[in-house]
Amino acid sequence: MSLNPRDVVVIDCVRSPMGRAKAGCFRNVRAETLSATLIDALFDRNDKVDPAEVEDLIWGCVNQTLEQGFNVARQISLLTRIPHTSSAQTVNRLCGSAMSAIHTAAQAIMTGNGDVFVVGGVEHMGHVPMTQGFDHNPAASKYSAKASNMMGLTAEMLAKMHGISRQQQDEFGARSHRLAHEATLEGRFRNEIISIQGHDDDGFPALIENDETIRPETTAESLAQLRPAFDPKSGTVTAGQSSQLTDGASAMLLMSAERAQALGLTPMAKIRSMATAGCDPAIMGYGPVPATKKALKRAGLKVEDIDFWELNEAFAAQSLPVIKDLKLMGVVDQKVNLNGGAIALGHPLGCSGARISTTLLNVMAAKGGTLGVSTMCIGLGQGIATVWERI
């Protein structure tokens, strides 16, 4: 494949193990530390890259308060070997924050405003709960459904609109845990996970090497015993087929193709296209459909051209309508979330966009795919998507 000088390429991508938000392995580790460990690992793994070349550190984070406040990207940068002369910014597109960080860096590279960027995201949902400090405007209900801020109810709505049954959701949830467990046992996460010091259940220091969120014993039958979490009377969405609350971070090293070539680096992939799109906040989980269609159109591609997909599993009730309307139902087991997803691994809000992209790029490398799409829904009615081409 020939590369244009301003093509945006990925040199490397990593993530932390995923820890439970409630009394999990990272309960005594701060968000900045999780992130800084990954950034230094990128430079350890790619010693031809001088940290002084980093134009900007761009970090996704949703709840920017407490330890995640006051431009957490800069707080993180100051803990790494990136020099003080490089800049840093924190971005927030709710669930799509880390993918927006990727897009922001890519746009800068494409327009000649920098050659080397470190991007990613973090969310410590144990230390900074999802709605910490949020003050919802009551007047918003004049303009969008009052339940739009209640993500579980938006998933219930999508399931009803698309005829997704409780059994389908339970089977999809069990699939996520099964595939993530298999990926762990077979070492498929080994290249993307950076081990980080945390604590075990007894409080002793421990090197955390694997995701602690995966429940290998999960079956569709066991999930069928759970009560609805958001609509007790007639709901189908349960905690067991929803994304977990977790602590985690992810990081990527992005570069212009010409700088990568000058440094003698072999990129993993390049960005073919990017897109964001809006949808009705009451069905926020549908956002990946218009975003993906827009990104594919910009790349001159069709759904059938894509070898592998990573869809953030906010809820099974949300993922299945997206899969259905992207016409992927018949190829799920060959192409979609082959190492499990957020139902098993969790959804640390500001981290997930880079996490799913990292997992996708490793799946593409392992299985020989050329084209991949990472896409996710975003609270309040948005979607974001990236089309990747393996080099």
UniProtKB/Swiss-Prot annotation:
The active site is at C95, H347, C377. Gene3D superfamilies: 3.40.47.10. Keywords: Acyltransferase, Cytoplasm, Fatty acid metabolism, Lipid degradation, Lipid metabolism, Transferase. GO terms for cellular component: cytoplasm. CDD domains: thiolase (cd00751). It catalyses: an acyl-CoA + acetyl-CoA = a 3-oxoacyl-CoA + CoA. It is found in: Cytoplasm. GO terms for molecular function: acetyl-CoA C-acyltransferase activity. Pfam families: Thiolase_C, Thiolase_N. One of its GO terms (biological process) is fatty acid beta-oxidation. Pathway: Lipid metabolism; fatty acid beta-oxidation. Its EC number is 2.3.1.16. It is an enzyme of class 2 (transferase). Signal peptide: none annotated. The keyword tRNA processing does not apply. Its main location: cytoplasm. Catalyzes the final step of fatty acid oxidation in which acetyl-CoA is released and the CoA ester of a fatty acid two carbons shorter is formed. Belongs to the thiolase-like superfamily. Thiolase family. Heterotetramer of two alpha chains (FadB) and two beta chains (FadA). This is 3-ketoacyl-CoA thiolase. It comes from Hahella chejuensis (strain KCTC 2396). The lineage of its organism: Bacteria, Pseudomonadati, Pseudomonadota, Gammaproteobacteria, Oceanospirillales. The gene is fadA.
